[in-house]
From Swiss-Prot:
There is a cross-link at residues 467, 469, 492, 622 (Glycyl lysine isopeptide (Lys-Gly) (interchain with G-Cter in SUMO2)). The modification Phosphoserine is found at residues 18, 33, 93. DCTP 2 binds at residues 119, 156, 333, 352, 354, 372, 376-377, 523. This is Deoxynucleoside triphosphate triphosphohydrolase SAMHD1. One of its GO terms (cellular component) is tetraspanin-enriched microdomain. Changing residue 142 to E/A: Impairs homotetramerization and nearly abolishes dNTPase activity. It comes from Homo sapiens (Human). Residues 164-316 form the HD domain. Mn(2+) binds at residues 167, 206-207, 311. DATP 1 binds at residues 149, 164, 210, 215, 312, 315, 319, 366, 375. The gene is SAMHD1. GO terms for molecular function: deoxynucleoside triphosphate hydrolase activity; dGTP binding; dGTPase activity; GTP binding; identical protein binding; nucleic acid binding; RNA binding; RNA nuclease activity. Changing residue 164 to A: Abolished ability to restrict infection by viruses. Homodimer; in absence of GTP and dNTP. Homotetramer; in GTP- and dNTP-bound form. Interacts with MRE11; leading to stimulate the exonuclease activity of MRE11. Interacts with RBBP8/CtIP. Interacts (via its C-terminus) with CD81. Changing residue 540 to D: Impairs homotetramerization and abolishes dNTPase activity.
Amino acid sequence: MQRADSEQPSKRPRCDDSPRTPSNTPSAEADWSPGLELHPDYKTWGPEQVCSFLRRGGFEEPVLLKNIRENEITGALLPCLDESRFENLGVSSLGERKKLLSYIQRLVQIHVDTMKVINDPIHGHIELHPLLVRIIDTPQFQRLRYIKQLGGGYYVFPGASHNRFEHSLGVGYLAGCLVHALGEKQPELQISERDVLCVQIAGLCHDLGHGPFSHMFDGRFIPLARPEVKWTHEQGSVMMFEHLINSNGIKPVMEQYGLIPEEDICFIKEQIVGPLESPVEDSLWPYKGRPENKSFLYEIVSNKRNGIDVDKWDYFARDCHHLGIQNNFDYKRFIKFARVCEVDNELRICARDKEVGNLYDMFHTRNSLHRRAYQHKVGNIIDTMITDAFLKADDYIEITGAGGKKYRISTAIDDMEAYTKLTDNIFLEILYSTDPKLKDAREILKQIEYRNLFKYVGETQPTGQIKIKREDYESLPKEVASAKPKVLLDVKLKAEDFIVDVINMDYGMQEKNPIDHVSFYCKTAPNRAIRITKNQVSQLLPEKFAEQLIRVYCKKVDRKSLYAARQYFVQWCADRNFTKPQDGDVIAPLITPQKKEWNDSTSVQNPTRLREASKSRVQLFKDDPM
């Protein structure tokens, strides 16, 4: 078969003085690269395709081809063949074996040359399959370059300038690492190259649905702008992936690389968001993309069972790198010891028993990142201010979608053509606008630029089993403003002067211990799954795995208003029987002594010194001209 010019491999300059191969030898003249009738990825070939490839190279010995079929030599095994294996397959001549080996090595080299290599600051040099590159080079994926990974956190941590784009590349890479490792350790799992490619695509595309400033958009803005809509960025990712596939002609490319679009697109979506349809009965396997014997594949990108997945591994490493925080979790070690075992008639990814402590450390790392960075008190208030600005601008921003239809910031999620155009750049569009209708939104963003932020008042927690319900969040500012501090104040504050931010901190599964949902195996019985309870690990592990933090901010920033806001806040904490703010005795020394539970006999504070501090505090504000 004669190749088209576009398919000719580029010739490299010779680096030695050896004579050229004579033109009548198969290794020089034969068409040894994949032809039009063969799949471009040799790893997808079965024995018949391997035989076809060898015949085209001039290797037509019946014994060789017969042994290839009988031994079921597939394309994936070609790089593993050496001279001794060829001899066993019936190639008796040493010269022929060398020619055959050279022929196959050229094929492998061509395949390697088609892989794109990028240099990632976290994972080093990453190889990307041509299909992944085709997906990356689309407007829908490139959009992720313009969405900050940590939203308003960049205004607090100057190194946190990374975006969803590079995180998505990292997750796609790690997904491939884990699924390849499982396949190599356990060939009986029959993980195909098609499975590998689908898992990598799911990792690559899992965050396509994020909006401006990442979690600020789906966690703060959408619930306020459209409270009737229960929308998540995972749902957005599935919709955007569908749009990416259809608008860029990706289905034929998927078929070219051995995928079956009808099944595999469904499988990729299910890995991102879970089952697309609820099963009729609980006992039924809820997924359509892969059968139950491939259930473990659904635990790689987004693990709904226990939260141990490659998404976390990448953002732990990447966020810590950019934040300047130490990452204590080693995902490479987890991959080394990961194994698939049968648990409750399902195949699940299990960890080695000795790794249980490291997994607790992983969830502790997650909690620590939330405390130190993701829920930083200044980062959160910047997210809140950006949300306020977007809400004020929502009615006046127009984004063109399919068919020329116009959408607002909050409704762009209904049309993926419009949503593709919605990124962090909307911040600058509002900030630099001259439209009088955007004046209020513009002023809020200017305050962020000038660092005139809403002021942090304090933090508290509910006591006992009490938790503030989500439906009560909206009424909390009014509660704070209704608290009547038993001190003389120069100003009176209203509900609209306060912002109350409720933060739910946990190990990823609300009150549950995620390790209770992890299966382990031991060295002596690697195919038998076991459970390990918390008490079997250490007596120093957490008793509770969730807590609620309540932070109060004041929109007024003058000193008298801030002093009043702190008195309102501490009084509210006392009225609601919340914990005493850590600096309560300093910011409200006349209020904290009135709460008996806050001043038990074990307190190390000196009452006399506390009274003196109170007098000093009152005197300070009394004489202050303000």
